[in-house]
Amino acid sequence: MTRLRGPLSAVDPWNLIRVMPAEGKTVNEKSLEPKVSSPTKIIAEVVTFVALATALSYIKVFSLPQGGSVTAGSMVPILWLALRRGPKIGLFAAAVYGLVQLAVEPFIVHPLQVLLDYPLAFGALGLAGFFRNRPFLGVNVGIWGRFLAHFISGVIFFASYAPEGMHPMVYSAIYNGSYILPELAISIYIIFLLHESKLLKIFL
């Protein structure tokens, strides 16, 4: 039998078989497949970001008597998770955060008010996940979604707190806007810093 000479003589055919990609896929095709995060990793992220948001919610600039406060960017972890993972995970994590807020700082006057002011209001932060390519728009949509839920709750359930002669809608807009607007400004600023510093990655 004739032996190969030259560079080909050093090639082991078994090595060629070992490096061939399985299932008929080329190396380039396999490298282009999207990476899918495991459910365990996603759950760990949800728990971590909800815990961080809860911790930040205790750092208050000021609080209002019927609920609502300006914090050290407590909405940012939830908004960032929504931008990072998309609306499905974002809405879930935001609703969980709302339930945690209900557990640690409840202000209850009616079951429907609880639904509006906690899982729906905080859950709206997850809407940011629909705008992964436009994070600052996503932050605005999420926070204004929260404002809307609190506003409706205020009109329906807190009208009696309005000063005499003031329409409940005006009262609710002023009351809820007094802490949502500063929270919006703080959140946008922190998201901007994180985005520019590349400390965290929005996209996987």
Could you describe each region identified by the protein language model?
Residues I17-L83, K88-F92:
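Hydrophobic transmembrane alpha-helices
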Residues L56-V70, V96-F130, V155-P163:
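Interfacial aromatic-anchored transmembrane helix boundaries in multi-pass membrane proteins
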Residues F131-L148, P168:
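Internal alpha-helical transmembrane segments of multi-pass membrane proteins
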Residues M1-V50, V170-L204:
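Alpha-helical transmembrane segments and their cytosolic interface
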Residues M75, D117-L125, F147, E183-I188:
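Core segments of transmembrane alpha-helices
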Residues L83-R85, L127-R132, L194-L199:
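Structural signal for the C-terminal ends of transmembrane alpha-helices
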Residues I43-V47, V76, P87-A95, V114-L115, ...:
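Hydrophobic alpha-helical transmembrane segments
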Residues G145-F158:
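C-terminal TM-helix exit segments that contain a strictly Trp-centered aromatic cap at the helix terminus
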